[in-house]
Design a protein with these regions (language model features):
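Phosphate/nucleotide-binding beta-alpha loop and adjacent structural elements of enzyme active sites
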Residues: 1-239
């Protein structure tokens, strides 16, 4: 609380009614939710998202403002401490406490008490792009499964996924590869890519699966399904 209060004087506050009207609230770490709103519009109130590596229900959330507009979806995180928070703050969402990997099994889960947003799986043969100088405070063995398995069990039949947010601390390509895009194909993909390069494995995977890069928001790349690019990126601009 003391840290929060000390930062208040540094934040810009609206000083008039006009400024209040133009105020835009964002909960995302890099304001991805504002870009998403630009893409998907304000009018949808009953749409669906998937949030992989969801963290807390409000802080750094790419999905919270959509929840406030009436959306709902599936939130997946390996940290069991987040489950009661999600059930209390976002009861319409289904929280799944699980790690995500290409094959079902058990993997080591690294936890950093002072940096919970940096918790990550240790996957054999995969190198996280996110490195911490400090060793993990706790290492536990947790159940993991492919994203395709989770979505097949939790997404209603014929339910369209309007967007999917993936933030798994450098292991995002693993999450992508574990999904069945023929069965569950989000219209928009938000994915953290520390490499940033257009030739990164994450970028290449998305393009090879028919997605086109729409925008880069700090570490997050926003891809749109190429099959509906004109509908989302062109017709939306005319609304």
């Amino acid at each position: 609380m003391r840290s929060f209060l000390s930062k208040l004087p540094q934040r810009p506050w609206p000083t008039s009614i006009d400024q209040m009207r133009n105020l835009q609230i964002s909960c995302s770490q890099f304001r991805e939710d504002l870009l998403l709103t630009h893409l998907l519009g304000y009018k949808k109130t009953n749409a669906f998202y998937v949030d992989v590596g969801c963290f807390k229900p409000i802080q750094f959330s790419n999905t919270f403002i959509f929840y406030q507009r009436g959306w709902s979806g599936i939130a997946i995180d390996a940290n069991p401490a987040f489950e009661p928070l999600w059930k209390k703050v976002r009861p319409r969402d289904k929280f799944i406490n699980s790690g995500v990997s290409t094959e079902a099994g058990k993997l080591e889960y690294l936890q950093f008490h002072n940096y919970p947003a940096s918790n990550q799986l240790r996957i054999p043969g995969e190198q996280s792009q996110f490195h911490l100088e400090l060793p993990p405070d706790r290492v536990t063995l947790i159940d993991t499964k492919p994203l395709s398995t989770i979505l097949k069990a939790m997404v209603p039949a014929n339910k369209k996924i309007d967007f999917m947010s993936i933030d798994c601390e450098g292991l995002d390509e693993v999450v992508l590869k574990s999904n069945d895009f023929a069965l569950h194909r989000p219209s928009v993909l938000l994915i953290e890519d520390h490499a940033r390069s257009f030739s990164s494995p994450v970028h290449q995977f998305c393009e090879q699966n028919g997605y086109r890069l729409h925008s880069l928001c700090a570490l997050t790349k926003i891809f749109v399904d190429g099959a509906i690019w004109d509908v989302i990126c062109c017709e939306k601009q005319l609304e």
